[in-house]
Design a protein with these regions (language model features):
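Radical SAM/AdoMet-radical enzyme domain recognition
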Residues: 50-69, 77-178
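Flexible mid-to-C-terminal extensions adjoining Fe-S/redox cofactors in radical SAM and related proteins
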Residues: 1-15, 35, 272-339
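Canonical Radical SAM [4Fe-4S] cluster-binding loop centered on the CxxxCxxC motif
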Residues: 6-48
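The −1 position to Zn-ligating cysteines in a subset of zinc-ribbon hairpins
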Residues: 24, 28, 258, 321
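C-terminal accessory regions of radical SAM enzymes
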Residues: 225-288
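Secreted/processed peptides and extracellular or luminal domains of membrane proteins
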Residues: 31, 35-38, 198, 204-205, ...
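Conserved C-terminal portion of the radical SAM core fold
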Residues: 118, 130-244
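Short cysteine/histidine-rich metal-coordination sites, predominantly Zn2+-binding motifs
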Residues: 43-53, 335-339
């Protein structure tokens, strides 16, 4: 893995709004914490979702925007489909994409193909056999319809052979897919713990040597590498010894780097109403982490953005769990050249 002193995007990218539309989910994966999903929360109404979209419109101004809907599981809420149709029909500067477990009712496949630019399906081996079959059937249908599609196969340490089989099937079908290790290597999360809802969770999996060997061989990597690649598949360049070159696996220790996360991302948690620059890093200005504000008082959000519009975010995190694919640099002078 190459050590970089700066990251840049060779191609322009739209601002990405990741919108967690609600906690409710039809899966209950042990590696997904209670703060991310449940099976009891009431779905948010169409009116609530439209109000949030009006905030997104105001926040993004005249920019071209990608909205990626996440959850929970977005497709279990009927109001989600109403919102998607409304945006697709009436708002031309927004492109829609969907991150889903893939177990939607087959009647919704045509809606997805019509209203969405692309879909990322996460295959979860812990799901019920009926739901997993539905997921694979839906994946094949979308592939046949020609929509942009990628499948993240969540490589469950206890169901590794099943996950390998799914990868082989997707490869044979010519469907873009990524075997994804579960977790980011957090030592404290590799064991079981009691979550806030009383459930047993294990959010980082500890793979044995044979599993690790299969993973790197499947990716065509001759020796294990630390770091991450972009989960959205973006092309990324790194500055290595003062020269720019394409990079894949990136060292994710950016603490103290100047970062443009606020210019490329916005995250909305519909369940809590909290709004962040980015879902996982939650970086703010002045070396802090936290929320921009809440949907119940968007005036405060706009006041914060206006007060900090000329300031640079300095990464406060020891590790970048996502967001490594946006312009950033160790040197503030190099960073200014990237913008």
């Amino acid at each position: 893995m190459l050590k970089t002193s700066a990251i840049r995007l060779p191609n322009p990218e739209r601002l990405m709004v990741t919108w967690d539309t609600g906690r409710r989910c039809n899966f209950d994966c042990t590696y997904c914490e209670a703060t991310r999903h449940d099976n009891k929360s009431a779905p948010h109404s169409y009116q609530e979702l439209v109000r949030t979209f009006e905030f997104v419109k105001k926040y993004t101004g005249e920019q071209l925007v990608n909205i990626n809907f996440t959850g929970g599981e977005p497709t279990v809420n009927p109001a989600f489909w109403q919102l998607a149709e409304y945006i697709h029909t009436n708002e031309t500067r927004f492109r829609l994409s969907l991150t889903t477990n893939g177990a939607w009712h087959p009647k919704n496949t045509d809606r997805i193909a019509k209203w969405f630019e692309g879909v990322t399906v996460s295959y979860h081996a812990e799901g019920h056999a009926i739901l997993k079959k539905q997921t694979m059937d839906n994946i094949k249908l979308l592939h046949d319809l020609g929509i942009w599609l990628q499948v993240n196969v969540m490589m469950h340490v206890d169901h590794f052979d099943e996950c390998k089989q799914i990868c082989a099937e997707l490869k044979e079908l010519g469907i873009k897919h990524n075997p994804r290790p579960i977790g980011d290597g957090g030592i404290d999360r590799k064991g079981w713990f009691i979550d806030s809802d009383g459930s047993q969770r294990r959010t980082s999996h500890d793979y044995n040597d044979e599993q690790t060997k299969w993973y790197f061989e499947y990716l065509g990597i001759t020796s294990p590498k630390e770091g991450r690649n972009c989960c959205g598949g973006r092309c990324v360049q790194g500055k290595v010894n003062d020269k720019w070159q394409d990079v894949n696996f990136i060292d994710t220790n950016f603490k103290g780097w100047a970062c443009s996360v606020n210019k490329y991302f916005l995250h909305i948690d519909q369940h809590t109403g909290n709004v962040y620059h980015h879902q996982t890093c939650q970086a703010l200005h002045d070396g802090r982490r936290g929320v921009l504000g809440n949907l119940n008082n968007t005036d405060d959000i706009f006041a914060y953005v206006q007060a900090n519009k000329d300031k640079t975010i300095i990464c406060p995190n020891d590790r970048c769990g996502c967001g490594m694919c946006i312009p950033k640099a160790k040197s503030i002078d190099v960073f200014k050249e990237l913008l």
